[in-house]
Amino acid sequence: METKLVLALIACGVICLLQTTPTEATGKHVQQLMKVFRAIDFDFTKKAFYLHRAKYGVQNQLRNPLYLKAMSLPRSAKLSQPCLKKMIDEVNDLESTFYAGFSFNCHDHDQYSMDCLEAAEPTYLDGLKKLAASTEQCLVQK
């Protein structure tokens, strides 16, 4: 009876070990991505509610999907720095377009109003989703 219990515990330990092995390198990849996302330069002189929405969009539409992808990468994988730099440039372009739609390019509502922000936000979020999908394709250096 005791032998069966020991064998069951050993089998359980081996199964747990096999499940954790592929994720050994995830910390490294996620930390590299964190450094890249910290390089996004938001202008803190802009209105606080605009900045909150812009950061929230980057976090949910871009950063979280890429973190999930990075966590599933093997240890031998290397992140493509040119791809990540291109992503940062495109994020800055999307953010500039979002701000323009919120401020001087808003013709249907008062400039800098919540109505302008809500009108410009779907385009910004869709752009971030598309950027996340394209970045996932080139994330790993070949």
UniProtKB/Swiss-Prot annotation:
GO terms for molecular function: toxin activity. One of its GO terms (cellular component) is extracellular region. Disulfide bonds join 83-138, 106-116. It is found in: Secreted. Zn(2+) modulates binding to host coagulation factor XII (F12) and high molecular weight kininogen (KNG1). Keywords: Blood coagulation cascade inhibiting toxin, Complement system impairing toxin, Disulfide bond, Hemostasis impairing toxin, Secreted, Signal, Toxin. The keyword Lipid biosynthesis does not apply. Residues 1-25 form the signal peptide. Pfam families: Aegyptin_C. Salivary protein with anticoagulant activity. Inhibits activation of host kallikrein-kinin system by preventing the reciprocal activation of coagulation factor XII (F12) and prekallikrein (KLKB1), and subsequent release of bradykinin. Inhibits host factor XII and high molecular weight kininogen (KNG1) binding to negatively charged surfaces. Weakly inhibits the alternative pathway of complement system activation in the host. Interacts with host coagulation factor XII (F12) (inactive and activated). Interacts with host high molecular weight kininogen (KNG1) (inactive and activated). This is gSG7 salivary protein. It comes from Anopheles stephensi.
